[in-house]
Structures are given as structure tokens and as C-alpha cells.
A protein has these predicted regions:
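Short, polar/acidic, helix-capping and beta-turn segments at strand->helix junctions
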Residues: 16-267
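Extreme N-terminal basic, low-complexity initiation segments
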Residues: 2-4
Length: 267
């Protein structure tokens, strides 16, 4: 078993009670929200560590991206286990089977790096599909890692989530207002996603006031509820980035992620 301490918190939102379990990934210097095998719900730096983010000028195909990430971490004198989050771009939404197959391939490198084990994955992730100018194959847009520091800055990254509650059954059975992109349907989808963001932050001891960046991924209009549902709760204190992209699985329409990171680089 992995040497990871666990803490269970029961969290509340408009959608009911969400039970989120956190664990510490000691080799990486961060704690994370336990999730499915392909990603964790989010990560936060442990005392003595800070999270830094690097964005590639041009997205790199997965294999090339992993090589560049490995080279960057080694240049920084950091272990591969410091890798804690990433942002991917894919050509088009996957079928459910295609998404599972991609994820199994993706976690293979994490397993070789000593991060993924026993279907436990501490790395947070978002994966979306640009509607304009998509990559030819799944690619890395950005990645995050921990660095040792004298004073913890409370940095964190919340994984991307769309409007499908995690659980049993296929995506079509879980997607909120499947096939409906009306204003009210998009509001309902967004409310669920906002709820997930807030509960994940709460599980890591964070709120919107601790965030430095909030991103929405959708190709549909959300202006009709932008102020009432997003601005009013403090989700855009540092502005909001709208990426014109679709979530990674067919049928999903609205995704978000959030981070609180003080050091960001472009390479």
C-alpha cells in the first residue's frame, strides 16, 4: 500500500452531500483528493512545498510532452514524483470507451515515474478539446509540480470537472440535461460544476479567495447567468478565462478548473 495518510470530510452543496477523501502523496510533497484511476480531484502543496505551473508555447503530443516535463524536472533538480497536475488538449471529444483506453495509456508513464500505483492516481488533470485549431493528437498544454520552499504559500490546483457526477453507469446516464444547451440547461450544468469546484477546494481547505485563476471550457453561451451564478460567488475575483473548447467526453458541455499558483512560466 502507498504511504499516504487519509482524511475524510463530508461536504455540502446544492446537489446534496459529497464525500471527498484526501490523502498525502509524500514523495511529491502534496496532498490530493482521491478520485478515479485517471486523475485526482485536486492537489495542494504540503508544508515546505509550493506548486509551480509551466505552460508550453505550443502544445506537445503526450509522448513528447512527458519527455519535456521529465527534462524540466531534472534540470530543476526535482524528482519525477513532484509532478502533480497537468492540462491536456485533445482533437475531439472521446467516446466513453475511447476515453478509458486513452487514460490507461496516459497513466502508464505515471506508473513508471513512481506516481501511479494500485489504480491510485494523485495527479490532478483537465483535458479539453479546442473547437478551433485543435491538436492532431492528445497533447500537453501545461503542467504543475512541487518545489521545496522555506514557507508554504498555500498553492493548489483543482482538476477539471464537467456536468457528470462521478459514480456508476455510463456518462450518458449521468450527464446533467444531456443534449440540452438551452439557457436554463446550461445554468443547471454550470451550477453543478461550480458546486464541484467549491467542494474540492473545501476538501483542501481553500476557497475562491485563495484562487489566482478560474477557467471555463465551453462552446455555449453562459453570459445569461455569468453574473448571477459565477461572479456573485467570488469565482472571478482575478478575472475569468473562457477557453472555447469542449469537455473530453461526447455529450458534455461545460467544464471548469481553478488554481491558486503564484509562480507560472512559459517554455
Amino acid at each position: 500500500m502507498l504511504e499516504r495518510g487519509c482524511l475524510r470530510r463530508v461536504l455540502f452543496c446544492d446537489e446534496g452531500i459529497l464525500s471527498m477523501e484526501t490523502a498525502i502523496f509524500e514523495p511529491g510533497g502534496y496532498r490530493y483528493i482521491r478520485g478515479p484511476f485517471q486523475y485526482s480531484g485536486g492537489v495542494a502543496a504540503e508544508p515546505g512545498f509550493s506548486i509551480e505551473r509551466v505552460r508550453f508555447r505550443t502544445p506537445l503530443a503526450i509522448e513528447d510532452g512527458f519527455l519535456r516535463i521529465e527534462a524540466h524536472l531534472k534540470k530543476m533538480g526535482l524528482p519525477l514524483t513532484s509532478f502533480c497536475a497537468c492540462e491536456l488538449r485533445s482533437p475531439a471529444p472521446f467516446t466513453e470507451e475511447g476515453f478509458i483506453n486513452f487514460n490507461r495509456s496516459y497513466v502508464g508513464t505515471l506508473e513508471r515515474w513512481g506516481i501511479f500505483r494500485d489504480d491510485e492516481n494523485p495527479v490532478a488533470r483537465s483535458n479539453v478539446c479546442p473547437a478551433v485549431g485543435p491538436p492532431l493528437e492528445p497533447s500537453f498544454q501545461a503542467f504543475s509540480y512541487t518545489v521545496p520552499v522555506a514557507k508554504c504559500d498555500g498553492s493548489f490546483v483543482i482538476a477539471g470537472s464537467a456536468e457528470a457526477p462521478e459514480g456508476q453507469g455510463n456518462y450518458n446516464a449521468r450527464i446533467i440535461r444531456l443534449g440540452d444547451q438551452s439557457s436554463e440547461a446550461m445554468r443547471e450544468k454550470a451550477l453543478y460544476v461550480l458546486c464541484v469546484m467549491e467542494n474540492r477546494m473545501a476538501a483542501l481547505g481553500k476557497t475562491w479567495t485563495n484562487s489566482t485563476a478560474t477557467t471555463v471550457y465551453t462552446v455555449y453561451d453562459f453570459h445569461t447567468f455569468f453574473e448571477d451564478e459565477i461572479v456573485i460567488r467570488g469565482a472571478v475575483n482575478n478575472g475569468l478565462t473562457w477557453v472555447y473548447a469542449r469537455p473530453p467526453v461526447e455529450g458534455l458541455d461545460f467544464e471548469m478548473d481553478v488554481r491558486g499558483v503564484l509562480t507560472e512560466l512559459i517554455i
